[in-house]
């Protein structure tokens, strides 16, 4: 009575293994031919999904990265980077080497960001801590870029891979960065630290007064909302909803601001 389900399972496993081997055996010329066909047909979504999987399953790491760099320049990217994590540690090592050869600041920031994206999905891997520690100094230096769009990406990535030493960077940016989204992502970066490499109890004493100052002074409604939402996640409170922040609901944000500042002003929390 169990033979049919067992046979189906075995058949599925065999097909999956055959597909894995097919992708592993793809060479650059195979991928180039497929890419040319995608270009000719206008990059249909269903075909792109299969091609992205082929890129990640192949051993052609350099060609995959070449297409990713081209994709980053598109107004409507195809997200070829979505499967780069399948290259595993070899892919991460390749990206670190690529950072040293980056032709533009944008490529440099986007490459470092891609490494961080992969690492945040690889917390269970043996290489995670060492790779994070290797990446953090690079990202920290990139938070000083004058390009606010690139600075935002660097700050987001620091939140994924940073440690206790990076708390001060977020505190400083949340209070003083000239770009409202950089201030917002600095606040959410502190919360991201607690979701990834740090326990919230390590963060709270270092950020309580900074959150109070930043929330009280913030003029941009969205940034203020993100700060409040980040603080409430860290301190276990509920002052505002994500929808109110996204909608920049002035009345709800101002009400939440008062509650947050009142709470953060307390001597003991």
Segments the model singles out, each with a brief description of its role:
Residues 1-92:
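N-terminal alpha-helical scaffold/docking segments in eukaryotic complex subunits
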Residues 73-74, 104-106, 148-149, 179-181, ...:
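Alpha-helix N-cap/helix-start positions at coil->helix boundaries
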Residues 64-75, 107-119, 144, 184-190:
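HEAT-repeat alpha-solenoid elements in large eukaryotic scaffold proteins
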Residues 116-120, 159, 191-192, 228, ...:
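Structural signature of alpha-helical solenoid repeat scaffolds
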Residues 148-175, 185:
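Internal alpha-helical scaffold/solenoid segments in large eukaryotic proteins
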Residues 232-269:
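Eukaryotic acidic, Ser/Thr-rich intrinsically disordered low-complexity regions
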Residues 28-32, 46-67, 86-100, 121-142, ...:
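Amphipathic alpha-helical scaffolding segments comprising HEAT/armadillo-like alpha-solenoid repeats
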């Amino acid at each position: 009575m169990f033979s049919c389900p067992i046979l189906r399972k075995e058949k599925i496993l065999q097909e999956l293994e055959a597909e894995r081997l097919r992708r592993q055996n793809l060479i650059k010329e195979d991928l180039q031919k497929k890419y040319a066909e995608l270009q000719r047909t206008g990059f249909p979504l269903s075909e792109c999904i299969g091609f992205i999987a082929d890129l990640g399953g192949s051993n052609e790491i350099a060609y995959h990265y070449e297409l990713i760099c081209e994709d980053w320049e598109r107004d409507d990217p195809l997200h070829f980077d979505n499967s780069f994590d399948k290259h595993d540690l070899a892919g991460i090592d390749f990206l670190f080497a690529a950072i040293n050869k980056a032709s533009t600041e944008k490529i440099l920031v986007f490459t470092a960001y891609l490494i961080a994206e992969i690492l945040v999905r690889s917390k269970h891997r043996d290489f995670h801590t060492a790779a994070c520690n290797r990446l953090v100094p690079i990202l920290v230096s990139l938070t000083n870029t004058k390009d606010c769009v690139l600075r935002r990406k660097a700050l987001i990535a620091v939140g994924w891979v940073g440690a206790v030493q990076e708390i001060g960077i977020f505190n400083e940016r949340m209070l003083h960065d000239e770009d409202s989204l950089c201030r917002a992502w600095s606040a959410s970066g502190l919360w991201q630290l607690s979701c990834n490499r740090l326990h919230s109890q390590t963060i709270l004493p270092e950020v309580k007064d900074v959150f109070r100052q930043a929330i009280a002074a913030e003029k941009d409604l969205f940034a203020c909302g993100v700060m409040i939402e980040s603080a409430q996640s860290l301190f276990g409170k509920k002052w505002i909803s994500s929808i109110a922040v996204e909608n920049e609901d002035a009345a709800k944000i101002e009400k939440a601001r008062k509650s947050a500042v009142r709470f953060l002003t307390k001597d003991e929390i």
